[in-house]
Amino acid sequence: WPDDDIAKVLKNGWCATFVYHCCMQIGFSLPIRVPNSPCRLAGVNAWYQWSKAANLFTKDSATFLPARGDIVIYRNIVPPEKKDDVNTPTDHMGIVVFVDQNGFQAAEGNIGNENMSGVIHRKHHVNIEGFIRIDGKYEYDGWKYDYKSGEIRTEPFTPTVPV
């Protein structure tokens, strides 16, 4: 990440970084941060904001069935004494790997802010904010944003290469 102090900022909060890494490994091109926002996709709230703005987020409901590959965003699943910011309800995330009628299994990094990863079974509709589904229609548009100035480009960005 571009910040020198990112390890201090994230502390043990690396579930979003785990999800980001998994997405990059399978070939998704994702922005590093939410355009015109201080949020980076190293944090759950940034994923929440970004996915809503990109129309990739579906709020949890009895009519929505998650599928393998969906990204799940949890709400108040981390105990308050282990949270860095108790005012942020979207506090954990993972990747759905299996769905059954009782719930789903998700691959998660930093489960319960205990600095460990694993595959864990979660019940449907319990502490779930919603799901991000990045389908074949998703197209990376990060080139449109100048993250330093906040300006929106209208032409594709071509970096200059020193000769």
Q: Predicted segments — roles?
A:
Residues 15, 43, 123-126:
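Alpha-helix initiation/capping motif
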Residues 7, 20, 24, 53-56, ...:
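A generic structural signal for solvent-exposed, polar alpha-helical segments
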Residues 76-163:
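Aromatic- and glycine-rich peptidoglycan recognition patches
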Residues 7-12, 29-114:
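...with weaker cross-activation on analogous glycine-rich loops/strands in unrelated enzymes
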Residues 2, 15, 48-51, 144:
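Short linear interaction motif-like sites in intrinsically disordered regions of transcription factors
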Residues 1-32, 155-163:
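N-terminal capping segments
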